[in-house]
């Protein structure tokens, strides 16, 4: 069995085609027979329902301070703190604003978080809400 790069709920940028270009979409499944991810978003739902595309047409979305703030993360003492309702103090810090380190409280948890889907996987692994907007 292959390890999947993306899981259900991940937000990604997908190259749809010449006329449409690329769109932000949500991974809703994986078809192992054709090795394609199944994606949807408002545009895809209106026109086709869902689409299946190969991994080479998917690009991770860079995790930025703007995206964190849009999702309720608050900057305090050099860390962005998670708005989760479960009470876990998940914090992110970055020297560059694009490569992040995760902490539980002040204890290191994971480094090299580069994309929205990386953060979603971390939150999923902690049993926290992984829904995000970009």
Model-found features: residue ranges?
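Intrinsically disordered, low-complexity, charged/polar segments
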Residues: 45-74, 110-129
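Acidic, low-complexity, intrinsically disordered interaction modules
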Residues: 31-34, 38-52, 77-110
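Short glycine-rich, low-complexity/disordered patches
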Residues: 76-82, 129-134
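Short beta-strand-centered aromatic/proline hotspots
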Residues: 19-37
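Short alpha-helix capping/helix-loop boundary micro-motifs
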Residues: 1-2
């Amino acid at each position: 069995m292959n390890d999947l790069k993306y899981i259900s709920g991940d937000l990604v940028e997908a190259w749809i085609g010449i006329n449409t270009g690329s769109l932000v979409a949500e991974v809703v499944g994986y078809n192992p027979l054709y090795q394609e991810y199944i994606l949807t978003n408002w545009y895809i739902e209106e026109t086709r329902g869902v689409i299946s595309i190969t991994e080479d047409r998917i690009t991770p979305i860079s995790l930025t301070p703007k995206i964190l703030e849009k999702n309720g993360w608050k900057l305090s003492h050099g860390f962005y703190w998670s708005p989760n309702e479960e009470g876990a103090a998940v914090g992110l810090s970055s020297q560059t604003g694009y490569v992040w380190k995760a902490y539980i409280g002040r204890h290191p948890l994971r480094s090299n978080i580069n994309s929205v889907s990386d953060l979603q996987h971390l939150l999923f692994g902690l049993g926290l809400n992984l829904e995000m907007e970009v």
